[in-house]
């Protein structure tokens, strides 16, 4: 009696590929309601000029990766901005609510795609940004405490908020 074996080959990449880790914590609508409960929003997307881009980079010390910024004007004053930064390897999507005076009202982590470092979602860590303005230094390990095991995520969110505060001064403040 003859046995037949079917050989199924798995691609080598399937055997050695790292496991993907991505969690969507909040949609845009949910983040808007968390930061500005009861308010309404008017989309006000911004496309930066090269001069604005350079000015933001100079003011913040952080590179601007995109010319288009997803922004909404909040009824009664304020701004809601969705942004992305790279954690260690993957993008972190977050939202920043700015008061009418350009100070940080609140930040929310919307999508986190890294395997480690999700502790940046901790409310106590995010609260360190409340009240910060473009005049604030926003330095990790100085006025923003680092989280062990989440250093790159902490650094890049801090840099992203710093860049968005400069963005407010240069592109949104009227």
Regions found by a protein language model. Name each.
Residues 21-147, 151-155, 159-174:
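Flexible, solvent-exposed loop/hinge segments and secondary-structure transition points
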Residues 9-10, 20:
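Cleavable N-terminal signal peptides
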């Amino acid at each position: 009696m003859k046995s037949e074996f079917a050989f199924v080959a798995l691609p080598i990449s399937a055997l050695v590929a790292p496991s993907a880790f991505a969690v969507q914590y909040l949609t845009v609508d949910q983040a808007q309601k968390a930061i500005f409960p009861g308010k309404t929003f008017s989309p006000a997307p911004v496309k930066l000029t090269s001069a604005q881009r350079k000015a933001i980079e100079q003011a913040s010390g952080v590179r601007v990766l995109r010319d288009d910024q997803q922004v909404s004007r909040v009824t009664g004053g304020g701004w809601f901005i969705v942004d992305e930064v790279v954690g260690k390897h993957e993008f972190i999507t977050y939202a920043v609510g700015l008061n009418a005076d350009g100070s940080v009202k609140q930040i929310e982590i919307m999508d986190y795609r890294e395997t480690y470092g999700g502790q940046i979602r901790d409310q106590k860590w995010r609260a360190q940004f409340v009240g910060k303005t473009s005049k604030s230094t926003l330095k990790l390990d100085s006025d923003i405490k680092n989280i062990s095991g989440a250093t790159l995520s902490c650094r890049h969110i801090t840099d992203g908020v710093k860049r968005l505060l400069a963005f407010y001064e240069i592109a949104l403040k009227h």
